[in-house]
Amino acid sequence: MLLPLLVATVGHAAWDNVLHWMIVNDPDTSIFHMHWLRMVIVYLFMWIIPSKKTKSTRSLWWWFTFSLYGWTLPAISYTVCVMLTGYRIAVSFQPFIPLLVVLQTGAVLEGYRLVGLNFAMLGTLSVWVWSPWYHKDLELWQIWAALFAATVQVLSLTKWFVILPRENTLYYMKHGVGGAILTLFFVMIIWAPENMSADFLAKPDKWLLVLTFAGIGTACKNWVISSATSRMTIDAVAIFECLHPVATLCSDIILQKDVFEYEDIVTVTLLAIGWILYPKRNI
């Protein structure tokens, strides 16, 4: 399970970097179109992974909300947050996902669960104490908009983990991705910006490689989540959704696309300690 998780984390980081680069350098970029293309690749790779067929009695409304909370809203809101202020606000909000899942499911906050969440929340606090976006030319509305987008991501993923079926999870996730593809298809109204289309046609091999790698990474993450639901508490599984923003921030710093702050070491260390200490087994 560690290898697919590593592939998923690196794949997500690569996708985040490329998508952010497109948004910064091409104002005509459609984030809906880019996410739709990636989800198509994810859908194809997920159907390669075998899963048991099951007779679902879920309503169409349940399927719509399942795909909306699991893929459509988190992807778009996370991208908007990063586009406005960078990755640090998004990173600071990640510990709220397992915390809210705990509160929603009625799990007891004690022992290592409480200690782990405290360390993760200290990581969040360290981001806001140092305000590491001060060197960016940001306006106040951008920070507030990023806060709203990050809140949407956290609340939607919390709802998704709460309603996530614990049996035959991969089957439901496959159909959830399919629902997200249909939703984004209607939202973007089959719109491909001319600049992005020209760039894609000029370097089709590069774009195909990026989309494929991103699709494999996300498919691996979905497989890890579906496999872990039967062996881990659902709040512990939610931690898997918290990894790729941290990986992307670290990769941006390494590639010198973002300004390195010594406080980043404190933040990442506290988050890592919290998630390592967090109890994983479903006892």
Kindly give the residue locations of the regions a language model identified.
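Hydrophobic transmembrane alpha-helices of multi-pass small-molecule transport proteins
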Residues: 46, 112-132, 262-282
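Transmembrane alpha-helices of multi-pass small-molecule transport proteins
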Residues: 27-73, 100-104, 151-159, 173-194, ...
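Glycine-/small-residue-enriched transmembrane alpha-helix faces in small-molecule transporters
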Residues: 1-33, 131-162, 183-185, 209, ...
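Specific transmembrane alpha-helical segments of multi-pass solute transporters/efflux pumps
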Residues: 11, 15-16, 51-90, 94, ...
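Helix-helix packing/entry segments at the starts of transmembrane helices
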Residues: 89-96, 160-181, 218-254
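C-terminal-most transmembrane helix of multi-pass membrane proteins
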Residues: 35, 39, 242-283
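Specific alpha-helical transmembrane segments that line the substrate/conduction pathway
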Residues: 33-36, 40, 79-111, 234-253
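Cytoplasmic-side transmembrane-helix entry/capping segments in multi-pass membrane proteins
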Residues: 5, 58-68, 110-122, 142, ...
